[in-house]
């Protein structure tokens, strides 16, 4: 029950951030959209800024959804490219590029760890599972450890998102990823 309320707040917040922008969204907007009391909001979050740290949860939910929809008979590399495209489409449609730019810059100057880089995230387990499949089938190289492969992949994804942010979201992130990411990740293949 408690996690349902927290998720409801997170979902309402990110919808509003996308619709109105982060700066224009108030805590009262979030409270009204989530249909909760002010006390309930503050029970789960100290401020609106704390909601930015939930982006990793939003993205992990999307990866969990995708893991249930993986196309049959697809090799590991193609599965990774498919998931990358799908998530980047999701990002473009649901998350303002300025929020990513803000989050990335905040993580660079912040002394505490990033929830986006938390190795316990579903995202990293998902990538590792697929890469392990690819390694077992002989599709992926063995010159890097699985951990290095996952890191390489996630760095590539962040590079594309950073490029999108630096261009003010002025290109189709999904299509850009579909075209460039396989070229960037070719080094994973045997």
Per-region residue spans from a language model:
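Basic, helix-initiating cap at the start of DNA-binding domains
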Residues: 1-20, 24-36, 49-50
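Short coil/turn segments at alpha/beta junctions that flank glycine-rich nucleotide-binding fingerprints
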Residues: 19-23, 73, 94, 137
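Short hydrophobic/aromatic patch on the recognition helix
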Residues: 35-45
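Alpha-helical DNA-contacting segments of helix-turn-helix folds
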Residues: 51-59
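Hydrophobic alpha-helical connector segments
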Residues: 54, 68-94, 146-153, 174
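C-terminal peripheral helix-coil segments that are non-catalytic and often amphipathic
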Residues: 86-89, 125, 129-137, 154-155, ...
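Short secondary-structure transition hinges
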Residues: 89-128, 139, 148
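All-alpha amphipathic helical-bundle segments outside canonical DNA-binding/catalytic cores
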Residues: 117-120, 136-152, 172-175
